[in-house]
Regions:
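Accessory RNA 3′-end/elbow-binding domains used by RNA modification enzymes
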Residues: 1-13, 17-38, 42-45, 63, ...
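Short, structured patches in soluble enzyme cores that scaffold and shape functional sites
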Residues: 10, 71-73, 132, 152, ...
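Phosphate-centric recognition/catalysis
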Residues: 48
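Short, charged/polar surface micro-motifs in flexible loops or helix N-caps
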Residues: 51-54, 75-76
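Acidic, low-complexity central loop/insert segments
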Residues: 59-114
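Long, charge-dense, solvent-exposed interaction surfaces that engage phosphate-rich ligands
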Residues: 109-130
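Pseudouridine synthase
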Residues: 126, 156-197
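Pepsin-like aspartyl protease folds
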Residues: 133-152, 191-199
Length: 274
């Protein structure tokens, strides 16, 4: 079973799961997963992994995430996008400086409500399930906007590029931008350009080592101990500080955690193939 890590480009109006199913058929691989669900109406970068590499998602460099979005002022939809639009109201035209100032006001750390219709889990429950009891109204998530810039303003459409932390919903951000301009707003277009170090390159196979958000450590004893999953001694490692590391050996690598002078395997015997 070949381990593969690559970036696919999800088309618009297809769910991430349905797109994954098509990739499974294309590559004839049963065990395949993705990181970072894209809304059905959104398109762009989706990190794909197969077999053993599906266990690596939480260790990858996936932040910041960069998007290009188009916001339509004056439109209202509970989904905050082009699905189920309930009404459109005429909105006054703004000057460019007002738009830029409004966008820049969202830079930095902040709290955000996930959209009512989303797959985000809050306290172990999906946001759309919490919505039924209005619980979601009190559930905010911490996010950060690293960069945001105006690409084009052709009233009532604002197109902007934004780089954010994991967990940020661009639909919610678009709604908040519109609200700050004293109107409703929905996204009419959303494309994810990259997830941290990951960008679309025609599904090119990637070396996972280059994308791990971990420091390399070095095992100074017999690699056979790693291969057999034997108990590890902290004195056999070059770096002995607390932390999570990857260790290469033969044609494999392991992910270990050092804490309180003890070494624990997080993952082991992951075969390198790229």
């Amino acid at each position: 079973m070949e381990n593969i890590l690559f970036v696919a480009k999800k088309p618009m109006f297809v769910s991430s799961n349905k797109f994954l199913s098509s990739l499974k058929k294309k590559y004839n691989i049963k065990k395949m997963g993705f990181s970072g669900t894209l809304d059905p109406f959104a398109c762009g970068c989706l990190i794909i992994a197969t077999n053993q590499y599906t266990k690596l998602f939480k260790y990858l460099k996936k932040t910041p995430k960069t998007y290009i979005a188009t916001l339509m002022l004056g439109a209202y939809s509970k989904t905050l996008d082009i699905e189920k639009i309930e009404y459109i109201k005429e909105v006054k035209t703004f000057d460019i400086e007002t738009i830029k100032k409004t966008l820049n006001s969202f830079l930095g750390k902040q709290t955000q409500h996930p959209p009512i219709y989303s797959a985000k889990k809050i306290d172990g429950k999906r946001a759309y399930k919490l919505k039924k009891d209005d619980i979601y109204l009190d559930k905010k998530v911490e996010i950060e906007v690293f960069d945001i810039k105006l690409i084009n303003y052709s009233h009532p459409f604002i197109t902007f590029e934004v780089s954010v932390s994991e967990g940020c919903y661009i639909r919610s951000l678009g709604c908040d931008i519109a609200n700050k301009l004293m109107c409703e707003g929905i996204l009419t277009y959303l494309e994810r350009i990259n997830e941290g170090e990951f960008k679309y390159e025609c599904e090119k196979k990637l070396n996972p080592i280059e994308y791990l958000n971990l420091k390399e450590n070095f095992y100074l004893n017999d690699n056979k101990n790693l291969e057999l999953g034997k108990k590890l001694n902290i004195n056999d490692f070059k770096i002995q500080k607390n932390g999570t590391y990857y260790v290469k050996y033969n044609n494999f690598f392991a992910i270990i955690e050092i804490e309180k002078q003890k070494v624990v395997y997080k993952l082991n015997k992951i075969r390198l193939s790229y």
